[in-house]
Amino acid sequence: MPAKKGAVPPEIYQLKVTLLGTSPPIWRRLLVPSDLTLAQLHDVLQAAMGWQDCHMHEFSVGRRHFGRPSPDDRLMGMPPVENERTVRLSSVLGRVGAKAIYTYDFGDSWEHGLLLEKRLAPDPNTAYPVCTGGQLACPPEDCGGIGGFYDLMDALGDPAHDQHDELLDWVGDDYDPDAFSVDDVNRMLTPARRHRGKASKN
């Protein structure tokens, strides 16, 4: 459906995404259209951080929870989950300084702090979303959460550790915890680029 004549282009949100509990922090800075649904934002966060989207996830803002609702949630006594496909980013993060939590993998419980740093006018020559900065590679999937990740780093950094060789084989020779490239992240974000500083057609 074509955008209505005179439709206002979505604002661009500058978000800082920090993997909580990491030191030094693993983080990304992203420019994303404010009219993304939270389901679309999930895809952006997976690509930007370097996750593989192998597990469940959820957004939380205050007492509200957003994700993929299941009839089993109520039976298990879990808080009600709003459908992330119908909620836009601008409706949950509206003011500069607003925060949310994005949790990925309920077993390892990777919690990401989302901070709205700026609200910007869109650049008509830029395809969004865009990564503008960051630091360090995200942990390997299924490594046991923050505690397991740092135990893994200790073992990989100590050739005398009794599990050094086994864990090195598990993560693979190409895993570098210090690696980060804006260009690489932006290549991963390419499939999510639907906005070029113009109004959404949705």
Give each language-model segment a name.
Residues M1-N202:
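Short linear regulatory motifs enriched in tryptophan with gly/pro/ser
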